[in-house]
Amino acid sequence: MNQLIHIYHGSQEIVRQPEYGKGRRHNDYGLGFYCTESEELAKEWACSSLSDGFANHYLLNLEYLSVLNLSSAEYSILNWMAVLISNRVFRPGTPIAGKAKRYLEENFAVNVNAYDVVKGYRADDAYYDFADAFLNNAITVEQLASAMKLGKLGEQIVLKSRLAFERNQFVDFAVADSSKYLPARKARAMQAETDFRRISESDSDGLYMIDIIRGQVKNDDPRIPRNISE
């Protein structure tokens, strides 16, 4: 990763000076400032209603910052899952889902708060259904990985520490036209529903969550898909 990177934050507001410690704690990677390296994706994220939004543009200096890249081959999709369920609001509806949550947190957890910056997939609400289905033993880990790749969710870059905020400089902003980007956002959600039905109904001989628990599968198991950004 380059030392200087351009990042974008989609919002209903122009954010010239992001505030450290502000935001929602139950986002994918906990409290932080959520951005992407794609201006187009930021514009889509900015348009959640009929109102236009903004893609706020920043230049982030990564020198001296510790970066956790959950999309690298060092981590598996279950590391990503463990981080996700530790931060997003997840209420297990079945005994297997409760056991799955505990097992993943105990065996695949990654401390994102130990880093200045976190890079990894964004699990929007449409694709969170896949994570829920996996925890409830409805799809395999291979099907989960396939869904994440097909979804093209885009990677997000999250500023976690005060130092990261200090090394982030506002450049400018661009208007996100809701007439263009809101339909794109809705189309992504509709595609997620289509993918979910197709993948969940397909046959798979892979690993279900119950197999992972019973087999005491760990993070170094070669059967667990890695580097899901490829």
Report residues per predicted region.
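ADP-ribose/NAD+-binding catalytic cleft of ART/PARP-like enzymes
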Residues: 1-28, 56, 222-230
